[in-house]
From Swiss-Prot:
Heme chaperone required for the biogenesis of c-type cytochromes. Transiently binds heme delivered by CcmC and transfers the heme to apo-cytochromes in a process facilitated by CcmF and CcmH. This is Cytochrome c-type biogenesis protein CcmE. One of its GO terms (molecular function) is metal ion binding. The chain crosses the membrane at residues 8-28. The gene is ccmE. Keywords: Cell inner membrane, Cell membrane, Cytochrome c-type biogenesis, Heme, Iron, Membrane, Metal-binding, Signal-anchor, Transmembrane, Transmembrane helix. InterPro entries: CcmE, CcmE-like_sf, NA-bd_OB-fold. Residues 29-149 are periplasmic. Belongs to the CcmE/CycJ family. Residues 1-7 are cytoplasmic.
Length: 149
């Protein structure tokens, strides 16, 4: 092998290694990324069972039903649409009806029930993501300005 051929082989091997590393990183991210949806988004274009997502909105008024132990069922709404959520675990102290919430989990196969792995309660509307706040304002359910007065 000439010097030029060796250099070309090293460059080609390095490029192959970098391409493999990039593909592995992209694959790892695609397996762990959870996209954010609101109930209205899922009403327009449903997500298949088993897909990890984040579901956000407000806890529906009168929707909290406690089961045995730490089981709880409630609905998440954006003012126009609502999705039933089932969670088995300890809820955050700030979790209550009408409060902002973000849940992460998957839809139950053959059902329209969202099974949450984690539940995050929003402390205050001031800390709500802009996309959620904009949607709630558009739907007329925003309580941010009144809550601070």
């Amino acid at each position: 092998m000439t010097r030029k051929q060796k250099r070309l082989a090293v460059i080609a091997g390095g490029m192959g290694f970098i391409a493999t590393a990039v593909l592995l990183v992209l694959f790892a991210f695609s397996q762990s990324v959870a996209y954010f949806y609101m109930p209205g988004d899922l009403a327009k274009s449903p997500i298949g069972a088993g897909t990890l997502i984040r579901l956000g909105g407000l806890v529906g008024e009168g929707s909290i039903v406690r089961g045995e132990g730490t089981q709880v069922q409630f609905s998440v709404t954006d003012g126009s649409d609502a999705i039933k959520v089932r969670y088995n675990g300890i809820l955050p102290d700030l979790f209550r009806e009408g409060q902002g919430v973000v849940t992460e989990g998957k839809f139950e196969p053959g059902s329209d029930v969202f099974v949450a792995d984690s539940v995050l309660a929003k402390h205050d509307e001031r800390y709500m993501p802009k996309q959620v706040a904009d949607r709630l304002k558009a739907d007329g359910v925003w309580k941010g300005e009144e809550a601070s007065q």
